[in-house]
Design a protein with these regions (language model features):
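Bacterial N-terminal signal peptides
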Residues: 5-15
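Cyclophilin-like peptidyl-prolyl cis-trans isomerases
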Residues: 17-201
């Protein structure tokens, strides 16, 4: 009986350690001295290498790396595709369960980085400071997403390799999803299999 109790206690301890505190993002500790960390997005359409920019969007980059660090983006879907506009993901698993979210980050859209083709930016709702896990790639130059009189959408990186993957994505058909009722959902699911932090250079 004592042995069983010790085993149960050990299992509970491991579970407690394994649990992620979603109030304490860890991205700022990832390659702390690297201002331009790179990640590889392994998707069902192909691989994309993105260089993140801490000099312009440290909060957004650290936020993104917090999700990468706990593998929150693994086996998620790009749930929104507007072929001449954006492809958006980071919010839902393949079964459409929501990704657990860290606290929202402050909007850094005034950093000078533009929503141009191949850039990655934080998705949000009408509240300019509501960005959490979701992000999008610009499939075109989208100056309407840059700040003007109102807050824009924070660009925090740029594709370095894999532009052809965006071109493939732009050709995919979309529909209204029967389960969710959402429009602009890719007919052929675009799966984000894994996001891999690249070795520091």
């Amino acid at each position: 009986m004592r042995l069983i109790s010790l085993i149960l206690l050990a299992l509970l301890s491991v579970s407690a350690v394994a649990a992620v505190d979603m109030k304490k993002p860890t991205g700022k500790y990832v390659q702390q001295n690297n201002l331009f960390p790179k990640v590889k997005l392994v998707t069902s359409v192909g691989d994309i290498i993105v260089e993140l920019d801490r000099t312009k969007a440290p909060l957004a980059v650290n936020n993104f790396l917090s999700y990468v660090n706990i593998k929150a983006y693994d086996n998620t879907v790009f749930h929104r595709l507007e072929p001449e506009f954006v492809v958006q993901g980071g919010g839902y698993k393949a079964d459409m369960a929501s990704v657990d979210e860290f606290p929202a980050v402050f909007n850094e859209s005034g950093n000078g980085a533009k929503n141009q083709f191949g850039s990655i930016a934080m998705a949000r709702n009408n509240d300019p400071h509501s960005a959490t896990s979701q992000f999008f790639f610009n499939l075109n130059d989208n100056p309407s997403l840059d700040p003007g009189k109102n807050w824009g959408y924070t660009v925090f990186g740029q594709i370095q390799d894999g532009f052809e993957i965006l071109e493939k994505i732009k050709l995919l058909e979309t529909h209204t999803d029967e389960k969710t009722g959402w429009q602009n959902v890719p007919k052929q699911p675009i799966i984000l299999k894994q996001v891999i932090l690249q070795p520091e250079q």
